[in-house]
């Protein structure tokens, strides 16, 4: 699974995609301006999904505890592209270590400095650069900064021969967000490391068909 992590006002890592709570709660404002207690008082998307009317914004620790027994791999995106939360890298690394999941976590971010910082904190961790625009010699750039993978946008890899270049780099290549069947089949056939999608059931079925 892929999830996004930010810090509350009191420095607790929470799992939420947007930098604000406007879209998913009845309140407005930045995640960073609410304490964990204040966020826990809110319900998430209760009007859109009444069957989950008690849903809350989870902490990263809660999510790791929930998936730990499953053996599933977790891709943690550090949401530091707009606001770089102080010490988020260390806080997240500490929680992953506490959960005993160091071997099952991938760290990624659009803020490449944040990923480089994570690599300094946990040199053995698997890391990847997220990006949507063209970065010249991106594979060389990743290797020179000791980063292990590339996470480009699907519309990016469809341009020119970028995918061929990335696959030839021996770096892990995970493409986002792949929601179209044709794109899924193309990338699975190309043997990318993984695809990031909102429709995992569809992707799993296409992968099974490709392996049949």
What annotation goes with each model-predicted range?
Residues 2-3, 77, 106, 152, ...:
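Residue-level detector of family-conserved "landmark" positions at structurally sensitive sites
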Residues 11, 89-91, 113-114, 137-139, ...:
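Short, flexible segments with low predicted structural confidence
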Residues 6-10, 18-19, 79-81, 110-112, ...:
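Active-site beta-loop-alpha junctions enriched in small/polar residues
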Residues 10-11, 71:
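Conserved catalytic motifs of the protein kinase core domain
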Residues 17-126, 145-154, 167-169:
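Metal-dependent phosphodiesterase/phospholipase catalytic core, i.e.
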Residues 1-7, 13, 76:
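Conserved metal-phosphate-binding beta-hairpin within the catalytic cores
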Residues 50-53, 128-212:
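C-terminal active-site rim and adjoining tail of enzyme catalytic domains
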């Amino acid at each position: 699974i892929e999830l996004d992590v930010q810090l509350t006002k009191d420095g607790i890592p929470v799992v939420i995609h947007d930098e604000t709570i406007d879209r998913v709660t009845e309140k407005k404002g930045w995640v960073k301006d609410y304490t964990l207690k204040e966020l826990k008082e809110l319900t998430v998307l209760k009007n859109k999904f009444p069957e989950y009317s008690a849903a809350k914004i989870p902490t990263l620790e809660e999510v790791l505890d929930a998936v730990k027994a499953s053996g599933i791999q977790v891709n943690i995106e550090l949401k530091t592209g707009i606001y770089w939360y102080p010490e988020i890298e260390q806080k997240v690394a500490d929680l992953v270590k506490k959960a005993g999941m160091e071997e099952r976590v991938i760290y990624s971010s659009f803020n490449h400095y944040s990923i480089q910082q994570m690599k300094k904190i946990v040199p053995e961790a698997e890391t990847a650069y997220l990006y949507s625009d063209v970065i010249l010699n991106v594979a060389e750039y990743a290797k020179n900064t000791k980063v292990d993978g590339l996470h480009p946008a699907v519309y990016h890899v469809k341009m020119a021969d970028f995918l061929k270049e990335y696959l030839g780099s021996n770096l892990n290549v995970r493409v986002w967000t792949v929601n179209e069947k044709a794109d899924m089949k193309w990338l699975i056939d190309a043997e990318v490391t993984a695809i990031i999608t909102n429709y995992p059931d569809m992707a799993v079925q296409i992968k099974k068909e490709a392996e049949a």
